[in-house]
Swiss-Prot record:
<keyword id="KW-0808">Transferase</keyword>
<comment type="function">
    <text>Catalyzes the transfer of a dimethylallyl group onto the adenine at position 37 in tRNAs that read codons beginning with uridine, leading to the formation of N6-(dimethylallyl)adenosine (i(6)A).</text>
</comment>
<keyword id="KW-0460">Magnesium</keyword>
<dbReference type="Pfam" id="PF01715">
    <property type="entry name" value="IPPT"/>
</dbReference>
<dbReference type="GO" id="GO:0052381">
    <property type="term" value="F:tRNA dimethylallyltransferase activity"/>
</dbReference>
<comment type="similarity">
    <text>Belongs to the IPP transferase family.</text>
</comment>
<comment type="subunit">
    <text>Monomer.</text>
</comment>
<dbReference type="InterPro" id="IPR018022">
    <property type="entry name" value="IPT"/>
</dbReference>
<feature type="binding site">
    <location>
        <begin position="8"/>
        <end position="13"/>
    </location>
    <ligand>
        <name>substrate</name>
    </ligand>
</feature>
<dbReference type="InterPro" id="IPR027417">
    <property type="entry name" value="P-loop_NTPase"/>
</dbReference>
<dbReference type="GO" id="GO:0005524">
    <property type="term" value="F:ATP binding"/>
</dbReference>
<keyword id="KW-0819">tRNA processing</keyword>
<dbReference type="InterPro" id="IPR039657">
    <property type="entry name" value="Dimethylallyltransferase"/>
</dbReference>
<protein>
    <recommendedName>
        <fullName>tRNA dimethylallyltransferase</fullName>
        <ecNumber>2.5.1.75</ecNumber>
    </recommendedName>
</protein>
<feature type="region of interest" description="Interaction with substrate tRNA">
    <location>
        <begin position="31"/>
        <end position="34"/>
    </location>
</feature>
<keyword id="KW-0067">ATP-binding</keyword>
<feature type="binding site">
    <location>
        <begin position="6"/>
        <end position="13"/>
    </location>
    <ligand>
        <name>ATP</name>
    </ligand>
</feature>
């Protein structure tokens, strides 16, 4: 199994599809927003044409109105791995959602499952209020995450209110060292300014492809703005434009800034992952990275076969 991780707009999708073609593999997505049907442009979901005939798993699995947890992801991930291996192919995992990657590769802690009623109440509060609560009940975990990382803040508070124990207690107890699968892991990195420029270009292309129309269609289908899915970057910023509260240009600027902030949080999250090798994507062409990963994978296979 090969895992390609990294921040948004680092070039993971293009690399993994070419790698799958080279190694006769199939792709498992590790993106928390690509699981939703009808949400394609704003999530940068690869189109059927962009997939170039490569089978993709854990994409379009639930409606935007349905709940989907890390536990659900792990179950779908395991099924995908089994299907791919039964075909005699290589699973290639790609994405930027570390909670999914961590859960699939190392398992879950003993923290309780999500309580969606409690979670909805927490999501109704503003970030600063939530973060202030977290600092009081779990300063250790609060110091590890950003004040705007609402998903992680809500999860940590949810665990605390359900158990009376800080989320950091469960993380420290699990340790996340034992692997559920053997894998060869890589994290794509890019020069900071280059990454910011790539994000701006990506957002512009999203608007050209019809992002506004996609969000309007979701609203017309009855998916409310309070849903977790509709609070994704690229969607929540369009909603006030549709309500005529902000201009289209302001909505676009918000998406760009929020995506940049999100990428910075991802970069921090992916630091110090000792089971993963960093690849400076800014310094290499795609074919050079392919050749490097291909050689590393073949060496890994040879090493395993001689043990």
């Amino acid at each position: 199994m090969i895992v390609i991780a990294g921040a948004t707009a680092t070039g993971k999708t293009e690399l993994c599809i070419k790698l799958a073609k080279l190694l006769d593999g199939e792709v498992i997505s590790a993106d928390s927003m690509m699981v939703y049907k009808y949400m394609d442009i704003g999530t940068a979901k690869p189109s059927v044409e962009e997939r170039e005939g490569i089978e993709h798993y854990v994409i379009d699995v639930v409606l935007p109105s349905q709940n989907y947890s890390v536990k659900d992801y792990i179950e779908d991930f395991d099924k995908a791995v089994q299907k791919i291996r039964e075909k005699g192919k290589i699973p290639i995992v790609v994405g930027g959602t570390w909670l999914y990657i961590q859960g699939a590769l190392y398992g879950l802690s003993d923290a309780p499952e999500s309580d969606w009623t409690l979670r909805e109440k927490l999501y109704s509060l503003v970030n600063l209020e939530l973060y202030t609560q977290l600092q009081k009940v779990d300063p250790e975990y609060a110091n590890k995450i950003h004040v705007n990382d609402k998903r992680r803040i809500v999860r940590a508070l949810e665990v605390y209110y359900l158990t009376g124990k800080p989320f950091s207690f469960f993380i420290n107890q699990h340790n996340f060292k034992s692997k559920r699968y053997n894998f060869l892991g890589f994290i794509l990195e890019r020069d900071r300014q280059e990454l910011m420029d790539r994000i701006e270009i990506r957002v512009e292309k999203m608007f050209e492809k019809g992002l506004v129309e996609e969000v309007k269609k979701l609203v017309d289908m009855g998916f409310k703005d309070s849903l977790t899915s509709m609070q994704a970057i690229g969607y929540k910023e369009i909603l006030p434009y549709l309500d005529k509260k902000i201009s289209l240009e302001d909505a676009k600027k918000c998406i760009i800034e929020n995506t940049k902030d999100f990428a910075k949080r991802q970069i921090r999250t992916f630091r110090n992952k000792t089971d993963f090798e960093k690849i400076e994507a800014s310094k290499f062409e795609v074919n050079e990275m392919l050749d490097y990963i291909y050689r590393k994978y073949n060496q890994e296979v040879r090493d395993v076969s001689t043990r």
